[in-house]
Amino acid sequence: MRAVVQRVKEASVTVAGDIKGKIDKGLLVFVGIGEGDTEEDVRYLVDKIVNLRIFEDDTHKMNLSALDLNREILAVSQFTLYGDCRKGRRPNFTGAAKPRYAEKMYDTFVKFLKNTGLKVEEGVFQAMMEVNLINDGPVTILLDSNKQF
């Protein structure tokens, strides 16, 4: 399971002109489900995301987490995080989980995020979405439950 985590001042996701999720200060999380990902991968990523110390303390040092500050999270599914571009010029997405399984794992991911007590908004699985954001920093972190990066 992979995630791109961005610290944002605000973010929203729109589908067919309707805002489906909107947050103020917090984290925008693009999440991709890989073939073979399990609930253990979900637990690992959720714990890592909500506890990442990427918010500044009073001394301007990145020392606080979303949990510490009760920040909001906008979760957006994105299978393209499994795009393999090592051969040719067109990404190969065979590493991404099949849609039915990926949706189940994505729903579990969102449920576990909500269980942390933080406000969690989300996009629409498999929809064409417009994501708007104002980066804060910018701060962007790549995570992989298989620790490939």
Curated annotation (Swiss-Prot):
Q: What is its EC number?
A: 3.1.1.96
What GO molecular function annotation could you give as one example from this UniProt entry? Gly-tRNA(Ala) deacylase activity
The answer to whether keyword Cytoplasm applies is yes
Q: Where is the signal peptide?
A: none
GO process terms (BP): D-amino acid catabolic process
For this record, an example GO cellular component is:
cytoplasm
Localization of this protein? Cytoplasm
- One matching Pfam family is Tyr_Deacylase
InterPro entries named in the record: Daa-tRNA_deacyls_DTD, DTD-like_sf
Keyword annotations from UniProtKB, A to Z = Cytoplasm, Hydrolase, RNA-binding, tRNA-binding
Q: Chief subcellular site?
A: cytoplasm
Q: Which CDD domains match?
A: Dtyr_deacylase
| Motif annotated as Gly-cisPro motif, important for rejection of L-amino acids, chain positions | 137-138
Please give the catalytic activity noted in the UniProt record: glycyl-tRNA(Ala) + H2O = tRNA(Ala) + glycine + H(+); a D-aminoacyl-tRNA + H2O = a tRNA + a D-alpha-amino acid + H(+)
Annotated domain remarks: A Gly-cisPro motif from one monomer fits into the active site of the other monomer to allow specific chiral rejection of L-amino acids.
Q: What quaternary arrangement does the UniProt entry report?
A: Homodimer.
Family the UniProt entry places it in: Belongs to the DTD family.
Matching HAMAP family: Deacylase_Dtd (MF_00518)
The protein's job, in short, is: An aminoacyl-tRNA editing enzyme that deacylates mischarged D-aminoacyl-tRNAs. Also deacylates mischarged glycyl-tRNA(Ala), protecting cells against glycine mischarging by AlaRS. Acts via tRNA-based rather than protein-based catalysis; rejects L-amino acids rather than detecting D-amino acids in the active site. By recycling D-aminoacyl-tRNA to D-amino acids and free tRNA molecules, this enzyme counteracts the toxicity associated with the formation of D-aminoacyl-tRNA entities in vivo and helps enforce protein L-homochirality.
Q: What is the protein's name according to its record? A: D-aminoacyl-tRNA deacylase
